[in-house]
Amino acid sequence: MGMRMMFTVFLLVVLATTVVSFTSGRRTFHGRNAAAKASGLVSLTDRRPECCSHPACNVDHPEICR
C-alpha cells in the first residue's frame, strides 16, 4: 500500500469512528428530545403575534415580522 492509500484509510477510520460516537452519544444525552423541544419553541414563537412588538424576539426571529 502506498502512503496516499494508507492516509486515505486512516481518514476513513477516523471519520467512521467520529460518526459512530456522535450518533451513539446523541441517544445517550437525548439529543433528539432537545431538538424536538427547540423546534416546538420556534413553532410556538411563530404563533405569537406579540413577538414582533418585543425587541428581543424581533431580533431573534426577523422572518416572523416581515
UniProtKB/Swiss-Prot annotation:
Signal peptide residues on this chain, from the entry's feature table: 1-21
Keyword Secreted among UniProt keywords: yes
Top-rank lineage group of the source organism: Eukaryota
Disulphide bonds in the chain: C51-C57, C52-C65
Pfam family, one: Toxin_8
Principal location: secreted
GO cellular component, one term: extracellular region
InterPro entries reported for this sequence: Conotoxin_a-typ (IPR009958), Conotoxin_a-typ_CS (IPR018072)
Subcellular location: Secreted
Propeptide section residues: 22-49
Region span, Ser-Xaa-Pro motif, crucial for potent interaction with nAChR: 53-55
PROSITE patterns for the chain: ALPHA_CONOTOXIN (PS60014)
GO MF assignments: acetylcholine receptor inhibitor activity; ion channel regulator activity; toxin activity
Keywords carried by this UniProt record: Acetylcholine receptor inhibiting toxin, Disulfide bond, Ion channel impairing toxin, Neurotoxin, Postsynaptic neurotoxin, Secreted, Signal, Toxin
Coiled coil: none
Expressed in which tissues: Expressed by the venom duct.
Family according to the record: Belongs to the conotoxin A superfamily.
Record remark: domains: The cysteine framework is I (CC-C-C). Alpha4/7 pattern.
UniProt function note: Alpha-conotoxins act on postsynaptic membranes, they bind to the nicotinic acetylcholine receptors (nAChR) and thus inhibit them.
Name by which UniProt lists this protein: Alpha-conotoxin-like Tx2
Organism of provenance: Conus textile
